């Protein structure tokens, strides 16, 4: 789905240590981080906050290893390993907070996801669901996306393989995230910023 998901960190070295510690535990070395990008905050980019990012795993044991590696390294748990039937009958996940308090999850769906993508899904907090819906409705065609599954507090955006959710359930709005998508053939160029400060392009 994503060409890149770029998180801007207040302390780049600290964020690299967090993601290396946790992703190493599920067998993903930095040269295989794929669509995940980290960059330092500065004059041209503010810190990413309020993001939930979930990573694909191949087993419940890998989910446990992700969480244990983070906790043993001193990172804060955001949810112990376990089943989450509220999401799906075979959903098994564990959650940690990165150095900027973004929520990072390892998830196993009871079956392997198809394809090489590292990121399973994102939850992006929004301050105004109606405004965010209008934003994504306008961008859906040139990004090759579909909106679906609307509920009072959230809706989902997907392509053929993956999805992400825009959520207005009282959580902090996601700020200063950068998303790049592959452009469908013949699509117009997109460079836009959502109402809460996430930048979106199909030039990735």
Predicted regions and their residues:
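Vicinal oxygen chelate
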Residues: 2-10, 46-69, 71-127, 155-156, 186-204, ...
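Short, charged/polar, Gly/Pro-enriched secondary-structure boundary elements
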Residues: 43-47, 102, 161-166, 172-173, ...
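Short, well-ordered alpha-helical segments in soluble proteins
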Residues: 74, 110-111, 123-126, 144
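Ordered, small/hydrophobic-rich secondary-structure cores
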Residues: 5-86
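Core segments of cupin and vicinal oxygen chelate
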Residues: 6-41, 125-164
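Short, conserved, surface-exposed binding loops centered on an aromatic residue
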Residues: 113-114, 147-149, 170
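Short glycine-/small-residue-rich flexible loop motifs, especially phosphate/cofactor-binding loops
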Residues: 20, 67, 98, 137, ...
